[in-house]
């Protein structure tokens, strides 16, 4: 039986999954957010915006996705179906705990991709997703159709010959954020994965393929956030995703581009601007 506890939830298969929450102190919440972290990250990614939203009477729950953080087998790619199932479970548990108020999904990077394919699954099953809207921050939609052929070929070869080999990303000279102090703290955090298996990168790419395709089915209220200085998810696949979103949902969709924004928008030096934009969008619902 799935249950939601103070610091974990029990998944459908009995796995104990860590959970963090940020709740309003002196008033009942007027809305609730489920925050889904990015690749190699974990639930603590939403600590600062979670505190901010709590001050605005918005409750937030975040959990370590399987294969990440303090979950069993951290570093091992769990597969897209497992990621979707866990998010579906958390949605049901949080909805049961907070009935009658709006529930939104926030997904950063890989978390955004998981949110997208979860909504797509509900549409494919001809059922309404039990959420009132989604917030996508630099969603991971860099699918193979927008990658150069040599990149996809090298990834396929590596995944099928040395799947357990680990990559560090050192030497790539990529900035995930302009908040250097925060990046250094992540480097010291033992729950942030530093060496990534090749087969996990392959699995992530499969997820990004699915997320880019899922854009066609995201017909619900949306807030999409993207930094023009993002060096992780290129502009081209992001623009392709935006072009694929259904015309029917355009009136209830807002896109914000941050001229000085990097990939980790909520943790950038201008992160508080992003938090306020999220809170304003939720308040206006």
Residue ranges of predicted features:
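Catalytic nucleophile-loop/oxyanion-hole region of alpha/beta-hydrolase
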Residues: 40-43, 69-99
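Conserved alpha/beta-hydrolase
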Residues: 50-74
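Short beta-strand/loop motif that positions the catalytic acidic residue
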Residues: 218, 224-226, 230
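Short alpha-helix in the alpha/beta-hydrolase fold that links the catalytic acid
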Residues: 220, 234-244
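Alpha/beta-hydrolase-fold enzymes
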Residues: 110-197
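Catalytic active-site module of serine/aspartate enzymes centered on a nucleophile-bearing elbow/loop
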Residues: 252-285
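N-terminal cap/lid segment of alpha/beta-hydrolase-fold proteins
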Residues: 1-25
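Acidic catalytic loop of the alpha/beta-hydrolase fold
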Residues: 229-233, 264
